[in-house]
């Protein structure tokens, strides 16, 4: 079960409610969505806050703000990241990512689609789980095939140059 937004209820009350649901067998575990580093630190300061199992955040090649401090903090605390919109949703941003010469070059060299390059990028860290949306069986199978794609250091470096991670704290992107 996920707390999707911070809201007006204190985190301590939310954690108590989640833990009660676990205790009653209504849910197996719980996590959060769209909580940034300061929110996660506050969450971990309340009793049982460290029982959080995941932080679901927007993350893709064109939205790398979490890499500055949230991703390292979550990694340090062994909390997986569930990347939503790992393919940058439909629209102009996704089109620009797919048409990027480095993305195209990697896709061509590997015999995969540019979309698969975008998805493979988010798996750079073992702690990242991705939940790409797909409405066609063909795309589901292409997404599944990415489990066998491991980009090289050189490929990651090329993508880093094309779409650099921020060098300072940025607001958490949300959809």
What are these regions (language model features)?
Residues 3-175:
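Beta/alpha (TIM)-barrel catalytic core signal, keyed to glycine-rich beta->alpha loops juxtaposed to Asp/Glu
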């Amino acid at each position: 079960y996920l707390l999707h937004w911070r809201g007006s209820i204190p985190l301590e009350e939310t954690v108590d409610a989640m833990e009660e649901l676990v205790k009653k067998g209504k849910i197996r575990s719980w996590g959060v969505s769209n909580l940034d580093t300061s929110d996660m630190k506050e969450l971990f300061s309340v009793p049982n806050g460290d029982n959080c199992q995941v932080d679901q955040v927007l993350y893709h090649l064109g939205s790398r703000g979490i890499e500055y401090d949230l991703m390292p903090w979550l990694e340090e605390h062994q909390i997986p990241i569930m990347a939503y919109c790992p393919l940058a949703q439909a629209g102009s941003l996704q089109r620009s990512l797919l048409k990027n010469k480095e993305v195209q070059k990697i896709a061509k060299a590997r015999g995969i689609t540019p979309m698969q390059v975008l998805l493979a990028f988010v798996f750079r860290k073992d702690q990242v789980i991705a939940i790409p949306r797909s409405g066609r069986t063909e795309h589901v199978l292409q997404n599944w095939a990415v489990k066998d794609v491991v980009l090289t250091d050189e490929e990651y470096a090329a993508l880093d140059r094309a779409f650099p991670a921020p060098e300072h704290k940025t607001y958490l992107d949300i959809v």
